Amino acid sequence: IPTPNAITDSTSARAALAGMYHGLQSLSSYGSDFVEVGDLSSDNAENSGTSTSYAEIDDNAMHAFNGTALSIWSQAYDNINRANEILDKVGALNNFDADTRGQITGEAYFVRALMYHDLVKYYGGVPLQLHPTTDATAGASLTRATVATVYDQILKDLDSAQAGIIDSASTTTVSAGAVRALRARVLLYKGDYAGAESEAAAVEDDFSYELVSSYPDLFTVTGTETSEDIFRVIATPIGDQQSYLSYDYFAKARGGTYTLRPTTNLLAAYDPNDLRGQWNISFAGSRRYGSKYRSITGTEHFPVLRLGEIVLIRAEALARLNRLPEAVAEMNRTQVRANAPIFSLGSNTQQQVIDAIVAERRLELALEGDRWPDLVRLGIAATVLDIDPTQTLYPIPQSEIDVAPGLTQNPGY
């Protein structure tokens, strides 16, 4: 985390940006934990290793001392603090031209919005920290903002990001397309379907992203950029900058740790001819393992935002707006690419189309951390997973409550 006096000009500000992106590579962020729990909490993946923390998450039986729930919370706030440091310091300096200032602060606003959306999906209302902190006791007076207030701040940050960012080409740093894509996701979760459709359409129409012709090409060992990438986190084989997604899913016979694996439920959801099932799930003998990520050297990049998701965001938004022929046409784009059975509108109702799109999201985005948040936002997690409704939010880490007694715990913990 930059010290208060470390950012003095555009060069040091860009170094601070690099540090901010490094935080996203962390094993407690997109390098491992945060991606994995999105499937482990759901019907997509199950614990196959020795981690008691992961076993609790798999069973939807966490307690307030769960180590993974703490690590993803702490890393998200660490990433937020890095963004806040940039925003506060760059905003106070007068030796930046307008374009440089806008680009640098725009990237920081985006990352802060991304982290708060990640947090609100798992924990519900969370504390809003909008300025950097360096004192470990600075959070003693924190309280939780409401979910609605957190969403308001996320959208405000995305507006600020869009106003500042001028770059529209990069996929490894924040671009204008990434801002529109994240806003589409946020609005879908918020239930603003007209807004989500409009933003997703802008991503499709105003930028040069294209679906790759073959699904496996999205997840290359070399991390080659594809036409579908919108924003991705870069991994390098150095300590906490590695991606552990392939290690954790790969069978031990393939050099992995086999910490978690796809469920038989997910396997059964794929048609035998669906290329996504063939790519995402493999077997070592009779033992199934996740094979979406295949760089056992830890260098595989993670697609935080990609066009396949945006297509399905638009499809769902269109369906909820009762524009069913358009919704089905959007959904068919990912089905055709995957050689999967093609859904036709026929006499299907609006709800049946929505259900088909939700099922398609599961198949397209499997093992990318989206299934649990989908089940929760749709209000079906308790039914699908046969769990108590109080288990659909993660516990606020007890160590955080110990420091800030004003933080209330989620029900059931």
Where are these regions (language model features)?
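Acidic, glycine-rich segments characteristic of secretory precursors and extracytoplasmic regions
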Residues: 1-38, 404-413
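Hydrophobic-face positions in mid-chain alpha helices that act as interaction patches
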Residues: 41-45, 51-55, 197-307, 364, ...
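Aromatic-residue-lined binding/catalytic grooves and analogous aromatic/hydrophobic interfacial grooves
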Residues: 125, 155-159, 165, 176-215, ...
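Conserved, well-structured interaction surfaces
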Residues: 52-123, 160-169, 298-305, 321, ...
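Inward-facing hydrophobic residues that define packing positions of alpha-helical scaffold repeats
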Residues: 17, 80-83, 117, 151, ...
